[in-house]
């Protein structure tokens, strides 16, 4: 049982920085989607223009700047929908269901499954996973439905993000 009086439920600056870096890394495969897939993305016109500009840049320094810019803009968009759209475009359907099954299997009290996930997806970190699962447990503890929905969406997006990033590194 978790003693909630001893838990600091603030998100650390390090975790926020890691989340921003993941979004920046994901902007590259997002920009390399086909025109048809890009049109289907649930995003604002401004974001789409910046994303398409990233696809056209060839200079390494300019590309790095634009990648950071698109990563920052992803925060202002509905990032969960963008990640889901990229995930669905990136993986075949069989693999999608296999990866998404982790969402139900992961549990804060099951360290073995947590370690197995981190071993399979090298882009993930055990501490980050633990923090996401801790938020779900905290939402259960406080019986906050809105926090629960947000925490589950964050976990699902994290699983998708690290699956894509791990696959990019192969």
Language model segments and positions:
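Basic, alpha-helical nucleic-acid-binding regions used in initiation and control of genome expression
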Residues: 1-72, 79-170
